[in-house]
A protein has these predicted regions:
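Feature captures the catalytic ectodomains and active-site-proximal regions of enzymes
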Residues: 1-261
Length: 261
């Protein structure tokens, strides 16, 4: 079998946990040593205090090779770019489950295009044990809106990519979470409907929502706590820009996580 990258996506969970200073999920694959060494050279022994994981779905490596100009703004902003190898089958639920458990499909149990709630240990469980506050911001019906439910953390489930990006920027400004996952499915939807390199899909690949100020919301609009294991309701939002920025700073300890209404 050809090897396209020295690390697989199962390295993501342990890599992020190690960088943020907590123990990886039980049984997770080894971290990406290149990423870890780079971070240690940049940060020394200091852990990463804030992390944003941005997931634009369906963007395969061949798109990067054929349409590199689209990715130039990311390459100019990102200090390190690493290829990682997928699992099989390379469909969204299987991949996200492998990324955030650190396990192969047979280990976490999602082996096809299905979206059950994972019952094995995940990055989010490991983060919560360490007092790290995670949140997921995603469109309704997506893999990220389903397979990691039933944890005492925040879920912001919205109707559109613009709303997702607006809420993500708002959450970054509020700075009440340590680990934020953001999902955009606009390219994936266009690719499946038309074709991977159709004009419609390539337009979606290039779309960046216009920036807009997102002030701190009024307290009356803030989400209220729900009991452990409760399902999220949809949260409101408006169009804004997505941000891709790993943060640093002193970790604040706040109240128990909330689930958005």
């Amino acid at each position: 079998m050809a090897v396209y990258a020295s690390n697989g996506i199962t390295s993501v969970a342990a890599s992020l946990a190690r960088l943020m200073g907590f123990s990886p999920p039980h049984g997770a694959d080894e971290p990406n040593l290149v990423l870890e060494r780079y971070a240690r050279a940049a940060l020394g022994d200091r852990p990463v205090q804030r992390a944003l994981l941005y997931h634009p779905d369906g963007i395969a490596h061949y798109l990067f090779a054929r349409h590199t100009d689209v990715f130039l703004p990311v390459l100019q902003a990102a200090p390190l770019a690493l290829p990682v190898q997928s699992v099989y089958p390379p469909v969204t639920p299987v991949c996200f489950a492998s990324m955030y458990t650190g396990l192969p499909p047979e280990g976490h149990g999602i082996c096809s295009y299905a979206k059950p709630i994972l019952r094995v240990d995940t990055l989010f469980d490991a983060a919560l044990r360490a007092g790290v506050r995670p949140a997921i911001v995603s469109t309704s019906g997506s893999t990220l809106s389903k397979i990691f439910l039933d944890r005492p953390m925040d879920y912001y489930i919205l109707d559109s990519v613009d709303e997702v990006n607006a809420r993500a920027e708002q959450l970054l400004r509020e700075d009440e979470h340590d680990l934020l996952l953001v999902y955009n499915g606009n390219y994936d939807a266009a690719m499946h409907r038309y074709a991977p390199e159709s004009p419609e899909a390539l337009r979606a690949l290039r779309v960046i929502p216009p920036p807009r100020a997102c002030g701190r919301p009024r307290r009356a609009g803030r989400p209220q706590p729900l009991p452990r294991g409760s399902r999220p309701r949809r949260a409101g939002g408006s169009a804004s820009a997505a941000l891709l920025l790993p943060g640093a700073g002193r970790r604040r300890r706040g109240p128990r996580p909330r689930t958005a209404r």
